[in-house]
């Protein structure tokens, strides 16, 4: 009932906005507009605010919705971090975005979540123990055993705060804490989700490591980020689009030093006879592509792999499958090549695709790069006004 009331009230506001300039702290930073859909905040808060007898209801939220919520919050965190804010300032600003939109619903339906959230935000300050105690008491008063949640979140934060390499040292512990999210026990899932939300409030950068366990792969990279990593870091990009799609839309335009870091492994359509006996042919095709990638000589389990497809649907499956196979540094290009925020719309430039010069993993063999490598014809495609 409380969740239904929240959903009804949340539909009245479309977007979250930061407080007016009169209530903002004066920051010598470039201001950035940060917003989150109300449904995003509800999905996250409902997971950790539900008492035990409502655990099943909380877990009934579709996993895709949870993943979408985590992605949106992560984007907001990244926006805040771009301004150069301190951890505490960033926490305040991001939490303000979440709290403002939920205020009407929280005041009536989830007062415990509101109290716990406000106290959790204070954990970034020196008064850690007192704030932790108050938040724990607020949650326990609703009948929800919050101790496992706070212990998990505190583990992440304590380790992060004990070293100058805060984020890097906290990531493996954050991931370890969240491994239990795959458990079938609803109460365990609620506790793990609560730890994720509190860790996000306490130390926003660690949230990326935690959300990895929900998402199933490392993260999304914008076309600009992808280009930068291919040019300056040891990253590889695997283009899983079909030959037909590449002929039609083109391939990413890359500097010469980055072209040898791109491999084409087209998704292969299953024979009609096989399609008729499998439940999800698209998933099978993507999983086969992931298996091929795992056998590439130039890729190992420590490799940084970026998956590119047309609209990311298959790329997500490939990245998740690779993670299951032990390849944990797998990313996808946001909106793929042809999506609204994809490579084509990024104005980074595209080249015409010439199949005869493509490095391709065929059904039975890998065509040597020495004889076939990514190349272009003389024409170069750009969006209008991209000069």
Swiss-Prot record:
Known tissue expression: Predominantly expressed in the shoot, including guard cells.
Key words of the record: Chloroplast, Membrane, Phosphoprotein, Plastid, Receptor, Thylakoid, Transit peptide, Transmembrane, Transmembrane helix
Annotated membrane topology: Single-pass membrane protein
Compartment(s) of residence: Plastid, Chloroplast thylakoid membrane
Classification via InterPro entries: CAS_plant, Rhodanese-like_dom, Rhodanese-like_dom_sf
Segments in the Stromal topological domain: 208-387
Record-listed Phosphothreonine modification sites: 380
GO biological process annotation, one example: regulation of stomatal closure
Domain Rhodanese: start-end pairs: 231-352
All ranges on the Lumenal, thylakoid side of the membrane: 34-186
Knockout mutant characteristics: Reduced growth.
CDD domains in alphabetical order: RHOD (cd00158)
Any GO CC annotation of this UniProt entry: plastid
Post-translational modification comment from the UniProt entry: Phosphorylation seems to be light-dependent.
UniProt main location, coarse: plastid
Pfam families, alphabetized: Rhodanese
Up-regulation conditions: By Ca(2+) (at protein level).
Transit peptide (first-last residue): 1-33
Membrane spanning stretches: 187-207
Additional remarks: Plants silencing CAS show reduced chlorophyll content and early bolting.
Function, in words: Modulates cytoplasmic Ca(2+) concentration and is crucial for proper stomatal regulation in response to elevated levels of external Ca(2+). May function by regulating concentrations of inositol 1,4,5-trisphosphate (IP3), which in turn triggers release of Ca(2+) from internal stores. May play a role in de-etiolation.
This protein's name: Calcium sensing receptor, chloroplastic
Species of provenance: Arabidopsis thaliana (Mouse-ear cress)
